[in-house]
Amino acid sequence: MNTRLVGSEMCIRDSVYSPKITNWQLSYDGRRKEPVNFPVKFPLLLAQGAEGIAVGLSTKILPHNFVELIDASIKCLKGRKFQLYPDFPTSGVVDVTNYNDGKRGGRIKVRAKINQLNKNTLIITQIPYTTTSSSLIDSILKANEKGKIKIKKIEDNTASDVEILIHLPNGVSPDKTIDGLFAFTNCEVSISPLGCIIENNKPLFTGVSDMLIKSTMNTKELLKKELENKLKELNQLWHSSTLEKIFIEKRIYRLIEDKDSWELVLEAIKDGLKPYLELLKQVVTHDDVIKLTEIRIKRISKYDIDKADKKIIEIENQIEETNYNL
């Protein structure tokens, strides 16, 4: 199945990874490049959760609260203990007593939030994870048909927020109905997590704590790669800026005015730079020399030495800061 990133997905793409340290490949139609994978710098798998099944293999990783994941990552970096529990976008009340760190054999219970609006009306404002307002209502109607609970009618006023009204017949106890809803409908569901991820192209059964540790270490490695890439770019910028300053300030460009061939021009520039090579941090390459020949006369005449010095100092400060961060 081939897909294309557009709109908000492109925005997310630009915010969760660095294109300069990402491996790219051509898209299915060859018109653009797309990432081989997303080197995300936060525990996206644990934040969103994941579920899948294959021959003899399955996984069910529950979603977790993003802020709690970040706090746990900080504790991980500080060598402190942490504990993670699932948190669901549909809200609801969860019992994590037997969560077992999201490993095989664990189990949690999630309940809808049900309140008594008046003596004949119940209101559901939060539903369990894995259910929808429609599937929840269907389970309530089936329980009513089987005589497990007694209801008069249901109103689904769900919009951006869940609001399901359950109208009860006269004389029916709201408390007993709530107990029946938890016992016989999807107002209470049991979920069995199964932590399974792919590591080095092999399935690995593990808990969410270990997943977070791996994610945190991966984030450190990605940040290190970004800083190393930034340092490389800054060093190259410093080299180019310093080389340009020497070329113009020492009037090396005048050495090429009477040269009749391209080879002689390049040789003259190399000879002119020799007395100043000790000021540079890296070797002057053939490409460096060619770039100097591309500087226009107008740019040379308007060259500001003080401005160039400030630019070089600014680059040096950025290099120092990047080295410190590394």
Residue ranges and their predicted role:
Residues 1-12:
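Single conserved hydrophobic/aromatic residue that forms the stacking wall/gate
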Residues 15, 19-20, 24, 38, ...:
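C-terminal interaction appendages of subunits in large macromolecular complexes
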Residues 25-31:
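Histidine-acidic residue clusters that define the catalytic metal-binding segment
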